[in-house]
Design a protein with these regions (language model features):
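C-terminal cap/substrate-recognition subdomain and adjoining C-terminal extension
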Residues: 2-9, 88-91, 95-224
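Short N-terminal signal/transit or membrane-insertion segments
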Residues: 2-8, 48-50, 62-79, 213
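Electropositive phosphate-/nucleotide-binding environments in soluble metabolic enzymes
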Residues: 21, 64, 80, 166-170
Length: 224
C-alpha cells in the first residue's frame, strides 16, 4: 500500500506574514506619489497628513477600534482614478515593493504546501488589486481580501463590501473549514478568532517571540 499524504486547508495572512509590512495604506501611498500632477489627490493627501498630525485617527481608534477609519480615509485619496491606472500601479507595486519584501521562511512554507497539493488560501485585509499579482506569481489559486470599489472603470475611493479583517476573516473562510485538517499562519493577535478555529495555528513573529502567542502555546516562526 502506498501512503498518500493528507491534503490540508492552509490559510496565510498577508501583511506581516508573507510580506514584511502592512500593505494596504502603502499601496495607496505608492499610487499617490505617482499621481502628484493631480491637484485633487494632493489636496486629499494634505487632509490625511493634517488628521495624522492632529492625532484625529488615533483618538477615533481608541473609541472605535474595529472601524479602521484611517484606512478608509487613506483609500479616499484614490477616488476618481481609473481602474486601468490603479491596476497598472498595483502590478508595479507588487514588482517593486512586495516581491523584494517577502518573509522568506513563510514563503518557503507556502511553496511546500502548494507542492504537497494542499488547498491554500491567502486571507487578508490587503487589497485584491495587488494581491492577485502575488498569488499568480506563486501559484496560489484562492484569495479572499478587501476589495477596492470601482464603478464604470473609475475608483470610488472606498471599499466594496466588508473589510477582510478580524471576525470578517472568519466569516469568509468558515465555509471551507468543516471536516478538514486546517492550518493558519498569521502574525497578528487580531486574528485570534481565526487561530482558535483551526487545528494547527502558527504565529509569525519578527525578531522575537510574541507573548500572546506563548500564552496560547502556539507554534511560532520567528524571522529577522
Amino acid at each position: 500500500m502506498i501512503f498518500m499524504p493528507t491534503k490540508k486547508i492552509v490559510i496565510f495572512d498577508f501583511c506581516g506574514t508573507l510580506i514584511t509590512f502592512q500593505t494596504a495604506d502603502r499601496y495607496v501611498m505608492f499610487c499617490v506619489e505617482r499621481l502628484h500632477d493631480s491637484k485633487v489627490v494632493r489636496w486629499r493627501h494634505f487632509i490625511i497628513r493634517m488628521m495624522d498630525k492632529l492625532r484625529v485617527f488615533k483618538i477615533y481608534n481608541l473609541i472605535h477600534p474595529d472601524n479602521n477609519w484611517r484606512k478608509r480615509m487613506v483609500l479616499w485619496q484614490m477616488k476618481g482614478v481609473s481602474y486601468d491606472l490603479c491596476d497598472k500601479l498595483a502590478k508595479k507595486y507588487f514588482e517593486e515593493e512586495l516581491l523584494p519584501n517577502v518573509v522568506q521562511p513563510v514563503v518557503k512554507k507556502l511553496k511546500g504546501h502548494l507542492a504537497n497539493g494542499d488547498r491554500v488560501f491567502i486571507l487578508s485585509g490587503g487589497y485584491d488589486i495587488y494581491i492577485k499579482y502575488f498569488a499568480k506569481y506563486f501559484g496560489v489559486k484562492e484569495t479572499m481580501s478587501s476589495k477596492i470599489a470601482f464603478q464604470d472603470g473609475v475608483c470610488l475611493g472606498k471599499m466594496s463590501g466588508k473589510d477582510c479583517m478580524r471576525e470578517n476573516k472568519v466569516e469568509c473562510i468558515r465555509p471551507y473549514l468543516d471536516g478538514e485538517d486546517t492550518i493558519c499562519y498569521t502574525d497578528s493577535q487580531s486574528d485570534l478568532p481565526l487561530l482558535k478555529l483551526v487545528d494547527e495555528p502558527v504565529v509569525v513573529s519578527h525578531d522575537s517571540s510574541q507573548h500572546w502567542a506563548e500564552n496560547h502555546k502556539y507554534k511560532q516562526i520567528i524571522w529577522n
